[in-house]
């Protein structure tokens, strides 16, 4: 549940004011699902004196809920921060999803900027699907990428 996730997240981040005061901080995480932990962590970093907070995410944005393993553990698409941003932009969380999954599209750029703005991040960058596949070392057809691009074949 969300309460337990929040508790675990707080135990993972123990800020040190002497190290953060007036500094530009780069914070890395594996993914952003709902954004709940991100909001709290960014606030803590600023509260402890960070001048800038930059975020780098190891995987591409989660655009689609996982129908296979429940990886995102979402009860619905609107739990995903990406879908909430898409709904704000388009008025429909299901509109033009393939454009929001394409890193070179204006829709993708706008969605990422909205997430950064929502959480007060100085900058936000996600790993690309292409770079992730390259790092894994298998052909894309052997890796499930459904939650990133909606493709379900592997």
What do these predicted regions represent?
Residues 1-154:
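PRPP-associated nucleotide enzymes
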């Amino acid at each position: 549940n969300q309460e337990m996730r929040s508790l675990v997240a707080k135990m993972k981040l123990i800020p040190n004011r002497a190290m953060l005061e007036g500094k530009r901080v780069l914070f890395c995480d594996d993914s952003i699902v709902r954004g709940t932990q991100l909001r709290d962590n960014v606030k803590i970093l600023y509260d402890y004196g960070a001048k800038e907070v930059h975020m780098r995410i190891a995987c591409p944005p989660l655009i689609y809920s996982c129908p296979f393993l429940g990886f995102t553990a979402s009860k619905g698409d609107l739990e995903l921060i990406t879908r909430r941003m898409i709904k704000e932009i388009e008025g429909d969380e299901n509109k033009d999803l393939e454009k929001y999954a394409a890193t070179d599209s204006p829709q993708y750029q706008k969605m990422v900027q909205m997430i950064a703005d929502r959480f007060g991040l100085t900058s936000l960058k996600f790993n690309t699907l292409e770079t992730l596949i390259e790092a894994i070392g298998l052909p894309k057809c052997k890796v499930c990428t459904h939650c990133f691009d909606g493709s379900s074949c592997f």
